Each structure stands twice: as C-alpha cells, then as structure tokens.
C-alpha cells in the first residue's frame, strides 16, 4: 500500500506540473497575453489538497479565479480544459455553451483554438454564438415550424476543395 501511495503521489505531482505549464501556454493564447497558473493548497496531504486557479488577464493583477468577471472566469476555465485536452486528447468532447459569457473577440480566439483541437478530437458544440458556428465544419439546428413538431436542419460548411485544385498537367 505504501508503494502504491508513493506512486500515486509521484504521478500526481508529475501530471500537475505538466498541466500547470500547458495551462499557462493555452491561457496566453486565448487571452492574447497575461498569465495563468495552478497552485496546490498548502499544509495538506497532496492527494487531498485543493487546487487554486490563478489568473492574470493582460493589464490586470494576478488574482484568484473567483475575483474575475464572468467572461474572464469562462475563458480561464476553457484554458484549463483545453490544456488537459492537449496533454491527453479524448476521442470526443461535448461542450454546451461554454463560451456564452465571452465577448466577440474572445469568442473568435476560442473558436480558432477549438478548431486546432479537432485534429485529435471530435467536438459536439452547443452554441448560439456566430463566431463559434463559423469555425464549425457542420451545423445542426433544431427548428419548430409548427407547435410541437421539431425539425432538424443540417448545413455542411466544409467547402469542396476538389473544384479548387488546378488540373494536373502531364
């Protein structure tokens, strides 16, 4: 049991440090600067310690995540989610309006970063934001033409690149 406990502690510390470094990288990209870091609660067993998320958006002082505006909180949380996703991509991910509190410029950075992650993960994103929809490959919408009857609408946004390629010359 002691050997298992030591292994868990070592693995936790290693993964925590990896996530901490990646979180700062993603934070800087999504915020266009600033700094994001993670801290473990002190004077507590590491396997039971809380984790503080510390954020410093560009032009602001370093502060606990709970002191941020709604949009800053959302973008900080998204940064942490994407940092973990970068380190250990899951095959698919469902995001339900996580960018709702963001302003348009932050939605654009979020959508561009999300699109980069689609190389390793399929995302199902529920959104009302045009900036997020613009980064999608395919949109599905639900409309109600008549009361009680829902209709599914699908729009494929991937352009057919075959017509754009120059003809081969021999």
Language-model features: where?
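Terminal ABC-like ATPase head and other globular end-domains that cap long coiled-coil arms
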Residues: 1-170
């Amino acid at each position: 049991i002691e050997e298992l406990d030591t292994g868990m502690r070592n693995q936790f510390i290693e993964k925590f440090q990896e996530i901490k470094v990646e979180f700062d990288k993603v934070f800087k990209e999504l915020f266009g600067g600033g700094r994001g870091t993670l801290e473990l609660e002190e004077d507590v067993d590491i396997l039971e310690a809380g984790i503080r998320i510390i954020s410093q958006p560009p032009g602001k002082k370093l502060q606990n995540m709970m002191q941020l505006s709604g949009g800053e909180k959302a973008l900080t949380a998204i940064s942490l989610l994407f940092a973990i996703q970068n380190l250990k991509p899951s095959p698919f991910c469902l995001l339900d309006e996580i960018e709702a509190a963001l302003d348009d410029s932050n939605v654009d950075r979020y959508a561009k970063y999300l699109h980069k992650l689609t190389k390793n993960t399929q995302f199902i994103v529920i959104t009302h934001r045009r900036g997020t929809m613009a980064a999608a490959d395919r949109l599905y919408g639900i409309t109600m033409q008549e009361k009680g009857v829902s209709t599914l609408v699908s729009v494929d946004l991937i352009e057919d690149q075959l017509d754009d390629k120059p003809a081969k010359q021999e």
